[in-house]
Regions:
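Conserved acetyl-CoA-binding loop-helix of GNAT-fold acetyltransferases
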Residues: 124-127, 133-146, 170
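Conserved beta-strand in the GNAT
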Residues: 91, 99-108, 126
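Conserved GNAT acetyl-CoA-binding A-motif
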Residues: 141, 148-161
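A conserved beta-turn-beta hairpin within the catalytic core of GNAT-like acetyltransferases
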Residues: 99, 110-122, 132, 179
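Short amphipathic alpha-helix that is part of the acyltransferase structural core
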Residues: 20-76, 194-202, 206-216, 222
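Conserved catalytic-core motifs of GNAT/GCN5-like acyltransferases
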Residues: 108-111, 157-159, 163, 169, ...
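A short helix-loop-beta-strand connector motif used in the catalytic cores of GNAT acetyltransferases and
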Residues: 79-91, 121
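Glycine-rich phosphate/pyrophosphate-binding loop shared by adenosine-nucleotide-utilizing enzymes
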Residues: 42, 97-103, 120
């Protein structure tokens, strides 16, 4: 592996230490978190510009087609993402091997609605086949979900396959009525507390109800 004298994080890693995993509806047995992922040789952190040499792209290829991405292309895209400030690619590293074995991306969308709020999208969730069974898939999803709330998102959305719906439901996500396999989790309007959606019934009418009593109820007119 190439030796580097300097490395750059995609975003400030200290924000991950502020996440309170006890407030997530996910059940960890035994309990783990981004700060304590269960093994001393596991580390949850932001993507680095040096992760090209730690197998990050090879890990993504377990999820989807990646292509023959060169180091220059990787570094260019990394720099673009960092400059935008809206990309929070988070990884799990096996520090014994210097290998990226889990990843998920939080992408921030800036809105005019909800008082010019921001919405999060969860994408590119993957854990190396040989590390499954260590709750790492759950860990990486909960990490970026809590991160979305920490950053002030009013909701987090994702699209998934049929077989993964139950998994995401255990983490607080619910299906969006009439929208295929889209799922969402909503936060308080002031993004101060993570709440689990407890209803699958859509609110009907021609306006969004944003009163805190109804805020966690999905409306087909709320985006």
């Amino acid at each position: 592996m190439v030796q580097y004298t300097q490395e750059t994080y995609l975003y400030d890693p200290s924000v991950l230490l502020k996440l309170d995993f006890h407030r997530s509806p996910a059940k960890f047995q035994p309990f783990i978190s981004a700060a304590n992922p269960g093994e001393t040789w596991l580390q949850v952190r932001p993507l680095k510009d040096t992760d090209y040499d730690r197998g990050f792209l090879q890990l993504l290829s377990q999820l989807t087609h990646v292509g023959n991405v060169t180091r220059t292309q990787f570094l260019t895209r990394f720099s673009q993402m960092k400059a935008s400030g809206d990309y929070y690619v988070t990884v799990i590293e096996d520090t014994r091997k210097g290998e990226i074995i889990g990843a998920a991306s939080l992408i921030i969308e800036r809105k005019f609605i909800h008082n010019c709020s921001v919405r999060g999208r969860l994408e590119d969730v993957v854990v190396n086949d040989t590390y499954r069974g260590k709750q790492l898939g759950k860990l990486i999803v909960v990490t970026v979900s809590l991160l979305a709330e920490q950053l002030g998102c009013y909701k987090m959305s994702l699209d998934c396959k049929d077989k993964l719906i139950k998994f995401y439901e255990t983490l607080g996500y619910v299906l969006v009525p009439g929208n295929s396999n889209s799922m969402t989790i909503r936060y308080d309007e002031d993004a101060s507390a993570l709440k689990r959606n407890t209803t699958s019934t859509a609110v009907t009418g021609d306006a969004c109800q944003t009163n805190s009593q109804f805020y966690n109820f999905f409306s087909p007119f709320c985006y």
